[in-house]
């Protein structure tokens, strides 16, 4: 579209958010380049790998259109499917819920998103690190400079544009996890209480193994380290550890604004993680599609880039608002001792707990 710049749009980061931006922009004719320091994209693994099925997403995010077009997960990217989620209280009691989920092979999943974006016409530059962006120019660490009319930061909560141009702070929960061989059943587990202060621990079963880990709020940890909590929790499971990973989840919800001038944030850099359950992959892709489509409309019809924020709020505003509220209430609850949490998590409150996890209003007055 543009002859003044090297590209119409440059996307920093080729994960689910960035590749989805590229896919939807490129299929409408936008000349887009994705730059990612990893090769292959998606490696090393940095998350729990669980996503809702398409039908579950339609229930969780009813204002998001064309879910089946957005989420095209091939069989080879799915380790196993599950139909139950167990919320585990400190006493070990399980509140059981129906939940249709997909346990991913995350690296394969992300590589598939790259393939779809490339087939749509997107360009990729891997193994290259972005140093900074100024105006319409992206500066790489190797000294290369590239220009674009629109520059998107999909590089995570510490992405170069987010870090340089956004002052708004957000709570980031450190996480540590492992992949373990063994047989762990077919129900997703979320554990709450002192096992993971201010956060939660998880066991997500996969074919022949599981993804096991936790995240904490350091202010709740009483001087103990993430490693202390992670090692204690993981040691409860029997199996051979084949991979250890760590990362961070932004848990304050979306920023007040994720467009400044010709800069856009998407995915973790924009806070597109649901605080009440840590869901980020599918949420980032929802934001990525909106951003990609708005970039095309901006270049073609001079639609303001801020339309991205407007459409996001229309599709995800209610869900994010409910999730942020549930996280705040949960943060207060999780300061309580385990015996009180055991009393609060019971058959009478089972529905309220599930509404919090699935980003519905917990109470009709809140």
Language model features with spans:
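Beta1/beta-strand and adjacent pyrophosphate-binding region of the FAD-binding site
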Residues: 2-17
């Amino acid at each position: 579209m543009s002859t003044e710049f090297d590209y119409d749009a440059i996307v920093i980061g080729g994960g689910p958010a960035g590749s989805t931006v590229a896919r939807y922009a490129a299929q409408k004719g936008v000349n887009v380049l994705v730059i990612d320091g990893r090769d292959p994209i998606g490696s090393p693994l940095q998350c729990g790998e669980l996503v809702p099925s398409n039908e579950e997403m339609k229930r969780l995010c009813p204002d998001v259109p064309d879910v089946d077009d957005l989420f095209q997960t091939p069989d080879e990217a799915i380790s196993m499917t599950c139909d139950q989620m167990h919320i585990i209280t400190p006493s070990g009691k399980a509140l059981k819920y129906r939940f249709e989920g997909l346990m991913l092979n995350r690296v394969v999943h992300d590589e598939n998103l790259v393939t779809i974006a490339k087939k749509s016409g997107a360009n990729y530059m891997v193994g290259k690190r972005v140093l900074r962006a100024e105006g319409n120019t992206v500066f790489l660490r190797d000294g290369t400079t590239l220009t674009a009319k629109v520059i998107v930061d999909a590089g995570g909560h510490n992405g170069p544009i987010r870090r340089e141009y956004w002052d708004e702070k957000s709570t980031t929960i450190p996480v540590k996890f492992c992949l373990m061989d063994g047989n762990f059943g077919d129900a997703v587990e979320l554990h709450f209480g002192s096992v993971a202060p201010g956060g939660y621990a998880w066991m997500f079963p996969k074919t022949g193994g599981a993804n096991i880990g936790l995240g904490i709020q350091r202010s709740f940890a009483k001087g103990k380290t993430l490693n202390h909590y992670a090692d204690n929790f993981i040691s409860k499971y029997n199996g051979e550890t084949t991979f250890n990973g760590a990362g961070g989840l932004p848990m304050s919800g979306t920023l007040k604004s994720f467009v400044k001038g010709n800069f856009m944030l998407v995915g973790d850099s924009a806070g597109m993680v649901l605080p009440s359950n840590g869901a980020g992959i599918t949420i980032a892709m929802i934001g990525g599609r909106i951003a990609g489509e708005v970039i095309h409309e901006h270049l073609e019809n001079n639609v303001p880039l801020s339309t991205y924020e407007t459409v996001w709020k229309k599709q995800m505003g209610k869900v994010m608002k409910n999730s942020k509220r549930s996280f705040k209430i949960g943060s207060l609850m999780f300061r309580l001792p385990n015996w009180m949490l055991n009393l609060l998590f019971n058959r009478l409150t089972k529905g309220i707990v599930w509404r919090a996890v699935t980003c519905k209003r917990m109470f009709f007055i809140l």
